[in-house]
Amino acid sequence: MNTTRSQAIFSAAQRLMPGGVSSPVRAFRSVGGQPIVFDRVKGAYAWDVDGNRFIDYIGSWGPAICGHAHPEVIVALQDALEKGTSFGAPCELENQLAEMVIDAVPSVEMVRFVNSGTEACMSVLRLMRAFTGRDKLIKFEGCYHGHADMFLVKAGSGVATLGLPDSPGVPRSTTSNTLTAPYNDLEAVKELFAENPDAISGVILEPVVGNAGFITPEPGFLEGLRELTREHGALLVFDEVMSGFRISYGGAQARFGVTPDLTTMGKVIGGGLPVGAYGGRAEIMEMVAPAGPMYQAGTLSGNPLAMTAGIKTLELLKQEGTYERLESTTERLIKGILEAAKAAEVPITGNSIGAMFGFFLCEGPVRNFEDAKATDTELFGKLHRAMLERGIYLAPSAFEAGFTSLAHSEADIETTLKAFRESFAAVA
């Protein structure tokens, strides 16, 4: 596979931007080799600057659930573009998307739009503390909630009740209020509440983990968190930036029947444009300025182009049979991946829900981030490169979920599984 232009462009980028990228995982540091520089995307495919075509299972890290550059989304954006790129003032499109989100997501009675998932999580953290009058929060090892200081706590070091900064520049005093527990471990959460009476504002988690690889909640875990937070007067927050509108139209909370107090969203609700949102019970959301005293603002929040793309995307997702089709596609994919690995005698465990999937190159089960770290990252790097050579674009990290879309055809899945069979055989 010729990647001459990608290599030249990335070489130049390294002189212009830290690491040559605008987000670290794109640099391929954890899988080796040079990153691919893309030229265009359409449907289930991405083309690089050298003309190579890939079947894409990243989908812009989640937003492209209808497929890249869906024709109806593009037409809607072209029409909206004629009216301007940004208003910096209220627009009716905000109302339309807000109504759609409120109708879909069980916990959301009011919503505030922002510009990214990180911004949504930063804002909801402030809101948790403002509403409860408490400073501490509980997060789970391996769960990612953006790069705000208080969320950058070292993961995978056991039940670290006093978080240590996971990045230079983050003061210990900032992360000292962040308590961590292993995912799927209710007893650890109970202990944190017992050790910090009347001090914990809430619990935030990815209800389905996608940033430590793909890890699903065990039966009773989400329900247990709901009971514990109510018992201790704390808030339960679902970070559905990744799972929202992807594992069901109402997200993980609709799928599992557990309603949090607050929810953060992003990715899918912007249809591929920068967006984030947070919402929840009206009595909590009414604390947000200008209705209440908790300040949060944004120059480009409620951007008409992002609202337009989000509205059209959700309209497409509401069509009959959408999620059944996504589920079937993803189940077929992960089943074939597991079979391919086992045929090559490669240890593997994996799973899927809705249009999310993931696998670890180790014996299962994987219940939390500590378990996930047993995956063979060196072997994954070899597998990633082998798949790339065969025209399949997987996330360049052993600790990221994969995504399918409505654009992935049966032929795409079969081509992908053929590549997995060949690649596992080559790297085993």
Swiss-Prot record:
Pathway terms, separated by semicolons: Porphyrin-containing compound metabolism; protoporphyrin-IX biosynthesis; 5-aminolevulinate from L-glutamyl-tRNA(Glu): step 2/2; Porphyrin-containing compound metabolism; chlorophyll biosynthesis
GO biological process: chlorophyll biosynthetic process; protoporphyrinogen IX biosynthetic process
EC number: 5.4.3.8
Any GO MF annotation of the entry: transaminase activity
PROSITE patterns assigned to the protein according to its UniProt record, in alphabetical order: AA_TRANSFER_CLASS_3
Organism: Prochlorococcus marinus (strain MIT 9313)
A GO-annotated cellular component: cytoplasm
Family label: Belongs to the class-III pyridoxal-phosphate-dependent aminotransferase family. HemL subfamily.
Catalytic activity, as annotated: (S)-4-amino-5-oxopentanoate = 5-aminolevulinate
Short name of any one Pfam family annotated for the protein: Aminotran_3
Record PTM N6-(pyridoxal phosphate)lysine, positions in chain: K267
Keyword Isomerase attached: yes
Protein name per UniProt: Glutamate-1-semialdehyde 2,1-aminomutase
Subcellular location: Cytoplasm
Keywords of the record: Chlorophyll biosynthesis, Cytoplasm, Isomerase, Porphyrin biosynthesis, Pyridoxal phosphate
Quaternary structure note: Homodimer.
Record keyword Isomerase present: yes
Chief localization: cytoplasm
Cofactor(s) needed for function: pyridoxal 5'-phosphate
